[in-house]
Structures are given as C-alpha cells and as structure tokens.
From Swiss-Prot:
Gene Ontology molecular functions: kinase activity; metal ion binding; phosphoenolpyruvate-protein phosphotransferase activity; protein-N(PI)-phosphohistidine-sugar phosphotransferase activity
Domain spans labelled HPr: 1-90
SUPFAM superfamilies for this protein: Enzyme I of the PEP:sugar phosphotransferase system HPr-binding (sub)domain (SSF47831), HPr-like (SSF55594), Phoshotransferase/anion transport protein (SSF55804), Phosphoenolpyruvate/pyruvate domain (SSF51621), Phosphohistidine domain (SSF52009)
Name assigned to this protein: Multiphosphoryl transfer protein
Residues recorded as bearing Phosphohistidine in the entry: H15, H298, H747
Organism name: Escherichia coli O6:H1 (strain CFT073 / ATCC 700928 / UPEC)
Gene name of this polypeptide: fryA
Enzyme class: transferase
Pfam families tied to this protein: PEP-utilisers_N (PF05524), PEP-utilizers (PF00391), PEP-utilizers_C (PF02896), PTS-HPr (PF00381), PTS_EIIA_2 (PF00359)
Cofactor(s), names only, from the UniProt record: Mg(2+)
Region span, PTS EI: 119-650
Keywords per UniProt: Cytoplasm, Kinase, Magnesium, Metal-binding, Phosphoprotein, Phosphotransferase system, Sugar transport, Transferase, Transport
Length: 831
C-alpha cells in the first residue's frame, strides 16, 4: 500500500464540487483508494463523492490517500501531482462578509419615513416587485407509498431520467449554472447515493418513496453535523436532487412547488433549491428573501451570477401578512420597504437611474483600451483555460487573451484530443474574440502535469523535469497535431503561438521547423489555414535572460511566466511549506532580471508581457508599468480594477519608482518604497459638464441631494456617495441652505470627496426646501475636500454675491443647456 499525505488546501472544505473532481481522479485507477481525514478519524471510499463529503473535511485538515492495487505506483504519482497542483482549483472563493456589508440607511431615504423590515445582505442590488410567498413542499405523501415489486425498476428508470434531464440542462447552460448542475449529476451517479436507497428497500423493506427520503435525511444529517458552514449548506443540494427524483417517479402525485412569474416578483421562501431557481423566469424575478439560505449555498451563487438581490434574516411569519403587496428589496442597505409611498418609490427611481448610469459607464470604461494617466499604452489581457471563459473575459474588458492554456484539453481523459476537437476549441475562442489577439500556449504537459496516456516515468523533481517543449521531440506527432489545429483555427482570427519552458535557441529552431512542416502538410491536405503565425516564447527559465538578443532574431514576442520563473530563479518549490516563504517575485534580483529582459527586447523592437499571478497584483502595478512591460495578462475578474488603477498612474513617476526599486538591497526596502509611493491625483476642475443638469424632475429635497451625491459617485469624484450624502445632510440640519430667489446651496467639507466639485440641478418644477426662503428650482451643491482650508468659504461667498445679482440669476434660469450654464459660471466665477 502507498500513501499520499497532505493538508486540505480547499478554503471551503471538501464539498460537492471538489469531491466530484477527486472522485473522478481516483476512479480511473484499478487500485482501491481510501481517503482519511485524521482530524475526524473518518474514512471514505475515494471513488464516492458522497462518501468524501461525509468525512466533514475542512481547510487545513490533515488527510491522506491510501492506495492499494496493481497500478498503485502510477496512481500515486498522478494523484500526488493532482493534490499538490490542481486540487485547489476545484474550489472557489466566495465573497467575504465585508464585501456583503449593508450600507447605512441614507438620510434621503430615512427622512421619507418608509415602512422597513431589516435583513442581512446575501447578494447586493435593488429589486421592485410584488411579494410572493412560496410554501415548502411536504414529502409525507411520498413517504407512505407502499413498497412494490416494481420499485427497483422504477428507481433505475428515475435515476436515468434525472441524469438525462441534467445532461440536457448542462448542454444549455454555462458558468455557475453548469458547474452546479455538474455537481448534482455527480451526486446521483454516485454509487453510494443509489446504493443506500437499494439497501433501505432490501434490508429495511422500505418503499421506494420512503427509501429516497430516508437516504436524503441520512446524508443531510451528516452534512448538518459538519463544523463547516459551507458543508452544512450542501443540504439544499441533497434535498434538491432527492425531491427531483420523487417528482420524476410520481409526477401525478404532487407537482413540485414550481412558480410561474408573470410580473416582477420578490420571492419569499424558507429556502429555494438550485433546480427551483433555474426553473424561474429571471426576467420577472426582482429579488428573493430566503429565511434559511446561507452565504455559500448554490442557490445564492446562482443568484449572484444572475444579479438577483437576496436578503436573509427576515422570518417568514413577519412577511407573510404582506403577501401580494408591492415592495422594494434593497440589498444595498439591507432593508425591505413594504408598500412604498410615492416619495419612497421616487427615491428608488433615482437610485435606479444612478445604477443605470454607473453600469453604462463601467461597460464603456471596460471597453476602452488601457492607458496610464499620461497616455502610456499597455495591453490588458486575460488568462483562460477554455473557450467558455472567453466571453466573460472580454466583458470584463480583456483586450485579448495573453495565455490560453491548451493543456487543459489534454487532461482528465484516456487519450489525447484529436486535431478536429482541438481545431473546434481554438476556433471557438477566436470567433468570440473578433480581431482581439489570442495567444495559444502549446501544451505544457509532462513533469508536474502528468498525463497517464503518455506513460512518462515518475520524476523526483517534476517542476524541473520532462515537460512542455522538452517532450515535444519524443511526441512529435502529438505536437504536430496541435500545430495543425492552431494553424487551421488561426485563419478565423488573430491567433498567436507561444512555446513554454524554452531554455535554448536550439529548441525554438526545432519548433520553427515543425511549424513549417505543419504548414506544408495543411497545404497538401487542402485545408484552410494561416500561412504564417506570430511566434513567441514563455520566459520562465533564467538561462533565456542572457541570450534574449539571439531569441529576438527568431521570435516575435516574449511573455514572462512569473510563477515558474520565481521558483527557478530562487530554487524554491512554492508548494513546499518549508521554503515557500522564500517565494517572492518582488525582490531586487527579480526586478533587475525583468528590467534586463524588457530593455534587451525593446532595443530589438520586440514586445514583452507577463502572464503569471504577478500581472494581476494591483499593489505591484506601478512597478510593472515602470519597468516598461507592454502587456499584463491576468485572471479576468481582476481586469476592471487594474484598468481603473492604471488610469491614475503616471508612467514617468512609475519609471522612477522602478529604478529606485532595482537599487534596493532587500524586498523589505521595495515594499517600503511601494507603501510611500503616492500617485499624483488626476486633477479635475471644480466645474464640469458631467455634474450639471437642466430640466430635472425631483419630487422633493431628498431626491435632489440623493441624485447629486450619487452622480459624483458615478463620475468617480467620490468612492463613498452614501457617506458624502450624510455629510451634506449634517450640514443641512444645522441650518437649511435655501438662500432665496428660488436657489439652494447645500454644501459640505468632507473627507469622502476625492475631487472637489460644484454640482448643479435646474428643476422643471420647484420643490419644498423646508426653508423660510421658499421653494427651490435651482440647486447648486458644493462638495469640497476636508483639506481645502478656507477655500469653501471663498467659493460659497462668490456664489452668494453673484446670486444677489438679478441678471446673473436670470441668465442661469434662462440658459438653454448644461454647456451654457458651465460657460456662464466659468466666465463669472474665479476660484
């Protein structure tokens, strides 16, 4: 017997998704494989995902796999690599509690005296609809169905039908839906799930209905006893597939409580299973209130992915009496507004207007090319492993794909993908990209990414071993097939080719020879293909740094693989806990190496990118910009924030920062430099067209202040519009800011304003400003930084003096548009 010992690396513990993947990895071997959680003293068949889930394994638990059988040597080698390298990728990090904290109730809402119920935010957003109560299903009618001689046949038929339905949904879905459906499919195909139902029928003489329910209750009891919130919340998945199985078996007995949404609806339920959520018409699902759903339930993951706001912590009996009434679910402030009056409805209409503006602006910003504040261009690309990830990456603002990991096509299967399968996968991502560049990294397999069907012997140091370009000559046919597939796909878009683990010029010369052979073959075969293709290499072996000049004669670009390069430069295995603290790319030696690569390549007209984890680290963006990199490729969710940060950076200041960092003596000195580095603020004028509005319709004073503060948030002049609004209201409560002549000047000095601003709204109809000076039809709001000194008094005084002038006031009221108001103020005022 052979053993693999490890600490569980999964942040959420061993739940359905990673359990299914581990089961799949173990099921390909003849050997018996037992999973042991030493903390729990729990053992499980590693070829059963349900058994694995039942071990209650949490993050950092001490675990082992015991392997015994004819292929135990090979199984241990492959499984050890999987546990060390890829097991953690089967889990996903959920939003933290801090990310889901509700905003304090804005004064512009609380002053309207809404009828509110307070809950906990599970998925952010705002939804308006009719409160609709969904009663939980009772399973009692299934439990009392008598046993029948046909029960075994019925069970097999129902399991097959449910599997067929799930497979059909898998073909129609993508993203989180597909992932969760895959987990459900794996559960019903698990031997333990069906086996225990059969056992309950045979040994305890239960009818099929009772056996399905008993099996569900037994599994749920194990999960409910877990110390992990995440594992406890998998109860909903077990209940979901069990209830689906019951309904398929006896559809005539009682239909599941599926709801048809014919109008905008706020759904109220004790809980909702993933399949129930997927059956809803999301166009009419305005929001959900779920009494028992936790922060990591699969239903909640689906809701977040679909931008459906969700609250919890509201007892059903407190809401039931409001069923059928209109409501607003505000999962930004964590409240449910019951039967809102006109003023409250008006508040949320303004909130929706601001949200629409923000969404439109974010979409436009993501679509813009990435530039620094002084217009230094840098490409921002995405790292992906499948064509399905491409649309999401482009939606996040990716200007291309800097790393397409083609090895994903070769993993977790019994044989290599053929040319046609690869061609279709590569073509799919190129068609999705349009004219955006896609860099296909040729298969980085072998070594640390063991592929059973290649039969490469086990190595002591797989990261330094027989992998990537090093195996291509032995598997020349496999490599040529991939080249042919990429060249064929390249005729449909902007494809580029990148070779991993290159360390010598001979390797790239051999690759270029194989590339020419593939082109000749495709011509001979009469297949559509690209005649030429841009060729680059991954710079991850330090030896390449010293002969960049020679490589510039043979390739078109370089992409630095910072993950492996860091390991090789320091001789550090980042998966070894004893030396992993030494793994740090932000050191003088690493930065000098990057500087050397970029300088040598640029001198010869070649571009340099980086595609490791470092490329998406916002803290180090000033250094990467300063070093002169042409491209940063990263996980696509990081792209919007990186683009936004880049626009605030001056490339010359960053270049000086990088120069100083390369002169440092230690990583600690570099970190201190970064901490002290303060990018110059993008100076914005006090008056700007984006903050001036004419012919605005507000019902009250609250809406005016809400809109003007919210608009500053949309325009990036504040990152805290709610807090800024509170400062405005605090000043307003000292003395109302109506100044007469139909004008109000709300104002504040605030730490929450990033760029001091004057905002103006000229109203269609005057509103009550709750001032002795009468109604207001022109609002001029001053929001000045807390460090402005007495400048706010100067600005306020100038405005007040001008407003006394009748001609000036008349000009403001008569101005045809926002530009005319801006021109008038710029002419008349001096700041």
């Amino acid at each position: 017997m052979l053993t693999i010992q490890f600490l569980c690396p999964l942040p959420n513990g061993l739940h359905a998704r990673p359990a299914w993947e581990l089961k799949e990895q173990c099921s390909q071997w003849q050997s018996e494989i037992t999973f042991i959680n030493h903390r729990q003293n729990a053992k499980a068949d590693a070829k059963s995902s349900l058994a694995l889930i039942g071990t209650g394994t949490l993050f950092n638990d001490s675990c082992s796999l015991n392997i015994s059988g004819s292929d135990e040597e090979q199984a241990r080698r492959v499984l050890e690599e999987y546990i060390q390298v890829r097991f953690i990728d089967s889990d996903s990090v959920q939003p933290t509690l801090a990310e889901l904290t509700a905003h304090p109730l804005p004064r512009s809402l609380s002053r309207l005296n809404p009828d509110l119920l307070y809950g906990n935010v599970l998925a952010s957003g705002v939804g308006v609809g009719t409160l609709t109560l969904l009663q939980s299903d009772s399973l009692d009618s299934y439990r009392v169905i008598p046993a029948s001689a046909q029960d075994s046949t019925l069970l097999e038929h129902s399991l097959a039908t449910l599997a067929e339905q799930l497979n059909q949904q898998l073909r129609e879905r993508d993203g989180e839906s597909k992932t969760i459906l895959s987990a459900h499919l794996s559960l019903i195909q698990d031997d333990e799930f069906a086996g225990n139902i059969r056992h309950l029928m045979a040994e305890q003489h239960q009818g099929l209905g009772a056996a399905i329910i008993s099996n569900m209750e037994q599994i749920c009891a194990k999960l409910s006893a877990s110390a992990s919130d995440y594992l406890r919340e998998r109860v909903s998945d077990i209940r979901d597939i069990s209830e689906q199985l019951l309904h398929i078996t006896w559809p005539e007995l009682k239909p599941r409580n599926n709801l048809v949404l014919e109008k905008p609806t706020i759904l109220v339920a004790e809980d909702l299973t993933p399949s129930q959520f997927l059956s809803l018409d999301l166009k009419n699902l305005a929001g959900m209130i779920l009494e028992k759903t936790g922060r990591t339930s699969h239903t909640l993951i689906l809701a977040r992915a679909s931008a459906i706001p969700v609250l919890s912590g509201l007892p059903l009996d407190a809401i039931a009496r409001y069923a059928g009434q209109p409501a607003v679910l505000d999962a930004q402030c964590g409240v449910l507004a019951i039967n809102p009056n006109d003023a409250v409805s008006g508040y949320y209409q303004v909130a929706q207007t601001l949200a629409d503006k923000r969404q439109k602006q974010q979409a436009q910003a993501a679509a813009q090319l990435a530039y620094s504040r002084d217009k230094k261009r840098i490409d921002i690309a995405a790292n992906i492993g499948t064509a399905l990830e491409a649309p999401g990456a482009f939606a996040n603002g990716a200007e291309g794909v800097g790393l397409f990991r083609t090895e994903m096509l070769y993993m977790d299967r019994d044989s290599a993908p053929d040319e046609q399968e690869q061609f279709e996968a590569y073509q799919q991502v190129l068609l999705a990209a349009g004219d955006k560049p896609i860099i296909f990294r040729t298969m980085d397999i072998g070594g640390d990414k063991s592929i059973p069907y290649l039969n490469i012997p086990q190595e002591e140091n797989p990261f330094l071993g027989y992998r990537a370009v090093r195996i291509y000559p032995e598997f020349a046919g496999l490599f040529r097939t991939q080249l042919r597939a990429i060249l064929r796909a390249a005729s449909f878009g902007n494809a580029q080719l990148m070779i991993p683990m290159v360390h010598s010029l001979d390797q790239i010369l051999w690759v270029k020879g194989e590339l020419q052979k593939a082109i000749v073959e495709l011509k001979r075969d009469g297949l559509r293909h690209a005649e030429t293709i841009t060729l680059g290499i991954m710079v991850e072996v330090p030896s390449v740094c010293y002969i960049i000049d020679h490589f510039c004669d043979e390739v078109d670009f370089f992409s630095i693989g910072s993950n492996d390069m860091t390991q090789y430069l320091y001789a550090v295995d980042r998966n070894n806990p004893r030396v992993s603290p030494l793994y740090n790319p932000i050191t003088p030696s690493f930065l000098r190496m990057l500087q050397q690569i970029v300088t040598a390549a640029h001198q010869r007209g070649k571009w340099v990118g980086i595609c490791g984890e470092l490329g998406g680290e916002s803290r180090y963006l000033p250094l990467l910009l300063g070093l002169g990199l042409d491209e940063l490729s990263m996980s696509s969710p990081r792209i919007p924030a990186v683009k936004s940060q880049l626009r605030q950076l001056d490339s010359e200041a960053c270049r000086e920062l990088a120069r100083q960092a390369c002169e440092c003596r230690s990583a600690q000195e570099i970190e201190a430099l970064l901490t002290a580095f303060t990018p110059e603020e993008d100076v914005r004028p006090l008056l700007a067209l984006e903050n001036i509005f004419v012919d605005q319709s507000f019902s009250n004073k609250e809406q005016a202040i809400q809109f003007l503060c919210g608009n500053l948030g949309v325009n990036g002049r504040t990152e805290h519009p709610f807090e800024l609004e509170e400062d405005v209201w605090q000043r307003e409560e000292i003395v109302t800011t109506g100044v007469g002549f139909g004008v109000a000047i709300p104002h504040t000095k605030s730490q929450w304003i990033r760029h001091s601003s004057i905002s103006i709204a000229r109203l269609v109809k005057p509103v009550d400003w709750q001032s002795e000076m009468g109604e207001v039809e022109l609002v001029i709001m001053l929001t000045l930084g807390a460090n402005e000194g007495m400048n706010h008094v100067k600005v306020f005084s100038q405005l007040a003096r001008k407003l006394v002038n009748k001609n000036f006031r008349q000009s403001l009221f008569a101005a045809q548009d926002a530009q005319s108001i801006l021109t008038l103020l710029e002419t008349e005022l001096t700041f």
